[in-house]
């Protein structure tokens, strides 16, 4: 990743790290890079989530885009995947989303989509970063007739809602509980599921700029679990702040995570002959129980590094149409170019309706193994070399031998911090504790700085 761009755009604490000045430059330089080969006046869609800093950053970003002659279509508050969908289907030059996913309200981010609806590749990000770091801004500064035009485009949200409804099936009064995380889905999820005919209970639908993801949403599903049980709902659907993730809750109040959601959708598509190459793309963090369930069904898997960016890269490279992460990013490439929590939710309820099975029945086919993750502080220079340390290598091999195939160990460096992550999965919590504690003791003794 670069100096400004991380794995999911530019992020930081709003007004301190991600300032209006930086947002203006990102609009100006990013817009220029993404539209310099356009033969007609370029058009860029801009959306945001509900953070209090969103309008401030949007104003600065839009000014930057307009300053290089780009026509800006302001979408207002809507889901990140809605921007990707609209860019691809309406022939825009690019899209920009101002959001910070599941992060707290003080953070914000700016994420670009190319004209194909996909997140920017490393080369385009490097071009933008080079302009940001240049000593002088040498980009054109057009006079009045060359400036961009600003257009409010609320109908973009309605088009996205209509599209998601078109991919579903009538729910005929199914009781559905929604948690929109006081975020981007608060403008659309209720409408989508009402149009599908669901009987709704909704929480996390009163954003005030500061309460996005605050004890609600996909990272805090506890409130939704209670609401599902109290309302007698058949399913609960929790989105994150920008609605690119989904965590579900079954009728008993139990969590159905991204691994289980991918399995349910993957099995459904496989049985219909619609799962490309009969393969699901997942990351190294997916649970062993998920892998065992896929093996039992004869479904193949491709495994990538952690991050939906890497999942999408593998899907595009190899022609797969389903992938995702345990955290709830699910990419359905036949429908959209990026993870889409509300799309995943529509597909999940469709599968329940078509199969006549409850969510707990569908999810029961995946037995999630207990998992434990411990972070150990190490010198940055050592985190990449940990697996070369003889004692560490030996203890991992010893633990894997003891597991005899009925468990999994993953030791990997953090991509952003001076940490070595030690993760284990096994049939019981006692076994998991034993494996992780044994390995971490050796790692700390050899290279730890705690």
Swiss-Prot record:
Mg(2+) binds at residues 101, 240, 242, 244. This is Phosphoglucosamine mutase. Belongs to the phosphohexose mutase family. Its cofactor is Mg(2+). The gene is glmM. Coiled coil: none annotated. It comes from Streptococcus pneumoniae serotype 19F (strain G54). NCBIfam families: glmM. Catalyzes the conversion of glucosamine-6-phosphate to glucosamine-1-phosphate. GO terms for biological process: carbohydrate metabolic process; peptidoglycan biosynthetic process; UDP-N-acetylglucosamine biosynthetic process. It comes from the Bacteria. It is an enzyme of class 5 (isomerase).
